[in-house]
């Protein structure tokens, strides 16, 4: 039994106690405004056959929590008591003891004073949705995933990837992997001290420590951990004092064989307004790129999410979402949630036509219709070859490689089938296109320069 689980003699009291902790975690994670809007009036009613029954004040609140937060609430309950298998949310109270969690302490992480600097609760900063189990792996993220798992599974020893530097665009899974590392360590090696926070919070805590003359406590907090994870390190660019403190913290941890995990929106070499000595150290370990999603990865993410939410979505709707929402995973999941919520509240069936109407504004603001011809022109220009080379059969490497990249991008950024793509490249068959895509995916596994090049091409085409 995990040391984090709550064991009481009376099972009813146990679940009431667990609900108090779950409510506090919801408050810590989502903040006061959202908590008061959705959770503050939710009651614990009873437990039956390992099912927790909660009561919402209205049908609207019940349906919204079910569609948006039921999986999160269940995972939180299971964190404290793994005998809980499901939750049920009703609107009519049942006889028996109820507990409403309405007034919670308003103290959040940002309010922690110096006397509490060393009592950091990593659980309050981790998102229960972000674990290795629900991270969908594909060619764009498999190196980063494997490295993150290696760090998490190192069982107290420092992994070979130290520091682990994850970089890529917004919403592609970097933060998910960092949270997953934290959860895995907490569950399998809870004695290890782990801190996860954004670079922005690191800076604010440092400034607060300077103002309150408590820098020693600040240093002790961050330099005594086993694993330090800093998200969005680009935030400290141009902030000299914070960079200086981060530099010494980095050196202390690395010198003492402590693990560091850092995320950024660009590679270390592309960071501006940051000291060269920091830039150099960020690249000491493993630098793993999380690059833009492919159609197949987006499809896998949607199918995984749909299975978790236990809903039925027509295949043409799933294909439509995977083809049209190409910018990042966060936006893809947001679009899916919007479609499901609309169906729940209007009681309308999920169809392709309804989905197109629901997401009309999102698609209009986001969509830059990319054609195979657009891709061919951009890649040909980038590699200084003739546009006609895209449809030729020339096998010279300086022509064949850009053509393969253009085929790869055509599959990633357009809804075209392999056969349709082949027609645009001199009437080549689908097996030729498939071979080109696989060849590029193999190269992406080890060629950091090529990954950056393709990421750049994707951004240019999408914008």
Swiss-Prot record:
Chain intervals for the UniProt region annotation (Domain III, AAA+ region): 125-343
Record NCBIfam families: DnaA
Region Domain II, residue ranges: 83-124
Location of region: Domain IV, binds dsDNA: 344-463
Name of the featured protein: Chromosomal replication initiator protein DnaA
Chain's role: Plays an essential role in the initiation and regulation of chromosomal replication. ATP-DnaA binds to the origin of replication (oriC) to initiate formation of the DNA replication initiation complex once per cell cycle. Binds the DnaA box (a 9 base pair repeat at the origin) and separates the double-stranded (ds)DNA. Forms a right-handed helical filament on oriC DNA; dsDNA binds to the exterior of the filament while single-stranded (ss)DNA is stabiized in the filament's interior.
GO cellular component: cytoplasm; plasma membrane
Keyword Transport appears in the UniProt entry: no
Key words of the record: ATP-binding, Cytoplasm, DNA replication, DNA-binding, Lipid-binding, Nucleotide-binding
Binding site for ATP: 171, 173-175
GO MF annotation terms: ATP binding; ATP hydrolysis activity; DNA replication origin binding; lipid binding
BP GO terms, sorted: DNA replication initiation; regulation of DNA replication
Residue numbers spanned by region Domain I, interacts with DnaA modulators: 1-83
Record-linked InterPro entries: AAA+_ATPase, Chromosome_initiator_DnaA, Chromosome_initiator_DnaA-like, Chromosome_initiator_DnaA_CS, DnaA_C, DnaA_dom, DnaA_N_dom, DnaA_N_sf
Similarity remark: Belongs to the DnaA family.
Domain notes: Domain I is involved in oligomerization and binding regulators, domain II is flexibile and of varying length in different bacteria, domain III forms the AAA+ region, while domain IV binds dsDNA.
Cellular compartment(s): Cytoplasm
Subunit description: Oligomerizes as a right-handed, spiral filament on DNA at oriC.
């Amino acid at each position: 039994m995990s040391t984090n689980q709550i064991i009481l003699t009376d099972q009813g009291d146990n679940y009431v106690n667990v609900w108090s902790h779950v409510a506090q975690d919801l408050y810590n994670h989502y903040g006061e405004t959202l908590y008061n809007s959705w959770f503050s009036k939710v009651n614990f009613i009873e437990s039956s056959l390992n099912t927790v029954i909660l009561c919402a004040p209205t049908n609207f609140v019940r349906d919204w929590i079910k569609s948006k937060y039921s999986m999160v609430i269940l995972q939180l309950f299971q964190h404290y008591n793994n005998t809980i298998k499901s939750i049920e949310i009703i609107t009519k109270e049942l006889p028996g003891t109820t507990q409403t969690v309405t007034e919670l302490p308003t103290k959040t992480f940002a309010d922690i004073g110096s006397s509490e600097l060393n009592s950091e609760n990593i659980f309050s900063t981790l998102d229960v949705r972000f674990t290795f189990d629900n991270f969908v792996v594909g060619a764009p993220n498999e190196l980063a995933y494997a490295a993150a798992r290696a760090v998490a599974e190192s069982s107290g020893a420092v992994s070979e990837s130290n520091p682990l530097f994850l970089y890529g665009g917004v919403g592609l899974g970097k933060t998910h992997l960092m949270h997953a590392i934290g959860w895995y360590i907490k569950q399998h090696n809870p004695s290890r001290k782990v801190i996860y926070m954004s670079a922005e919070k690191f800076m604010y805590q440092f400034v607060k420590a300077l103002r309150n003359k408590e820098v020693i406590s600040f240093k002790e907090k961050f330099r005594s951990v086993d694993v330090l994870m800093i998200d969005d390190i680009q935030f400290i660019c141009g902030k000299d004092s914070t960079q200086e403190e981060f530099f010494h913290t980095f050196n202390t941890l690395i010198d003492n064989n402590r693990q560091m995990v850092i995320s950024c929106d660009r590679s270390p070499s592309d960071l501006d307004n940051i000291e060269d000595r920091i830039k150099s150290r960020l690249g000491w370990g493993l630098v793993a790129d999380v690059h833009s999603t492919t159609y197949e990865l987006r499809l896998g993410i949607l199918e995984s999410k749909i299975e978790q939410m236990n809903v039925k979505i027509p295949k043409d709707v799933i294909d439509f979402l995977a083809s049209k929402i190409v910018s990042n995973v966060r936006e893809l999941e947001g679009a899916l949630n919007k479609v499901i919520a609309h169906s729940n509240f209007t009681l309308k069936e999920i169809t392709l036509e309804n989905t197109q109407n629901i997401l009309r504004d999102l698609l209009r603001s986001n969509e830059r219709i990319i054609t195979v011809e657009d891709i061919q022109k951009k890649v040909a220009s980038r590699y200084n070859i003739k546009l006609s080379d895209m449809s030729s059969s020339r096998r010279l490497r300086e022509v064949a490689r850009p053509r393969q990249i253009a085929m790869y991008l055509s599959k990633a950024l357009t809804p075209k089938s392999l056969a349709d793509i082949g027609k645009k490249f001199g009437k080549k068959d689908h097996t030729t296109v498939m071979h080109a895509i696989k060849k590029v995916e193999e190269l992406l596994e080890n060629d950091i320069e090529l990954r950056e090049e393709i990421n750049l091409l994707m951004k240019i085409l999408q914008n």
